[in-house]
Design a protein with these regions (language model features):
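Short, Lys/Arg-rich flexible segments
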Residues: 1-76, 93, 97-144
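Short, surface-exposed beta-strand/loop "edge" segments at domain boundaries and coil↔beta transitions
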Residues: 79-93
Length: 144
């Protein structure tokens, strides 16, 4: 085990470990988020629209990055994917002729607007991201 000879060296050693832990957390959290988002398709069968699969392919992540005394990663759903497909079956049931991608993703998450699927995937993902981060930091900084 390396011994720091100065506070600056100690800080660098700690930040290197935090960066490694956050890189591990990001990898696990990204996979868990993909699994949760894909689970949306495990329930419900739409009758007035055809699933595009865009939600399931929308998970994006940035690798761990450091700046000063902080390390972070970001996981999000890419809402720039186009789902603006007019659907006359929607208007005949009182819905708008189309929904924007953010509206579709929000309806899928909340289980509203007639969107069929296992809702709550983002809330579950968020909890797993926190847990994955805690687990990774605990693994790297566990007392021995």
């Amino acid at each position: 085990m390396k011994v720091a000879s100065s506070m600056a060296e100690l800080e660098k050693m700690i930040m290197d470990e935090i960066y490694s832990a956050m890189s591990t957390a990001k990898s696990k959290a990204e996979q868990d988020t993909k699994t949760e988002v894909q689970s949306f398709y495990s329930q419900g069968s739409p009758t007035i629209y055809v699933r595009t699969g865009n939600l399931g392919n929308s998970v994006r992540a940035n690798g761990a990055s450091r700046g000063g005394r902080s390390v972070e990663f970001t996981i999000w759903l890419d809402q720039s994917i186009s789902d603006n497909v007019p659907n006359p079956d929607f208007t005949s049931r009182g819905f708008p002729s189309y929904f924007t991608t953010p509206e579709i993703f929000q309806a899928a998450e909340s289980g509203s607007s007639g969107v069929k699927g296992k809702s709550g995937f983002w809330a579950r993902s968020f909890e797993k991201i926190k847990s994955d981060t805690d687990d990774a930091l605990s693994m790297y900084f566990a007392r021995t």
